[in-house]
């Protein structure tokens, strides 16, 4: 009988195979090109059955001078173990900066991707938050978008669908006149029409379109088109219309003359203008649609397997100064030949006719191999630009992410050195039976800083041994740039989870918590951003305006 002698290299080969398998499993998912003809949001899970709710202390996560406060807490201010919350948008009352509201996708149980329209509000500048529940208990909702008018009235645009057969894919509009504490459906069920990946803006110019609302969405929609308008502050909405070249996955804004601009990506990025959307008795037309070079394309997958790695944000300067009516666009894009995303920025000083060459905001040296995703920004009343995004530059596994911040005081010509403003978190933890942490985060700026709503996985769920997705608020500000934040250990809950004998995960409404501190935005001297050379603008002819038919 032939005998075999074990090779001394066999254990080494096995070890190499195990390491290879482990490494492969840690690799990000492939990236993919998003398109609007297949919805990114689907009603494909029923609600999870009722369960006993466990809680742990709410998370307050300091990182140097920046402090993140958990938003989705129960009636007692505790973290709810086993739920998930992501894809958050923030609104700020311009008449009282201590009053803010955040909307998000609320998953009552991570075993089901059934989601609802969660919301929370604060009256003390974000130190404490109240989470009364969801807009409409038991109804599937997604893609939350919130905004405020100049009086401090908040609006919440929410996507709805049906199950098990998807018979509609429409939006409706809600309004709050008490700082986000309660919300009323003003458009009627599915009354805003719309569709998937919708966004909206409010005309606050005081002109003929004052308080008009404008909405854009993608091709997975309720009644065709990509755009519609409300001339009565969100109550009734007109039949949707097409936008030439079909820019989607973007946002809208209105300049001081009442011109509407829509940013998004079709075959390339576009900036579309309607100069007559503000005229109530005219059908809106898009009289200028200009291609924009953002230095890459939008993408999905990768570090956020089932979601986008970012969308296109467009915002306009309303400072009234030399930069007034500048149009800015920012997006996390996948550059040609690269497998990870960069935060890129462009500027127009001539009403969207031409744009600057794309400028990279993330300043890390090994940026080509790192992820810079969910990039978003806002324009302060004085014209300062604040940008935030998720960033893996400090992660050996190229997955753990931190929220980063940069600002510009010269219309985006130069940007300050990037600074981390949060602890590190693993975005692949706590998926609610859907492999993503949403599709976007948001920021709203005032004269001394920016208010950010983002999702992170700082809390731990002992029932499944994973971190869990929650919504956080953090205030970023230029004064923090002078300090080098020292990472502080994430504040881990130490209390034993407490079982609460209740059959629903949705917190009940409670009176607004007594503020523990009075929030007053304190003006800090704004350091001059460290100049970083802007690329020389690429010479190109001025595109001829494209007229909508």
What spans do the regions from the language model cover?
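Bacterial N-terminal signal peptides that target proteins for export
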Residues: 2-12
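C-terminal PAP-associated
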Residues: 27-485
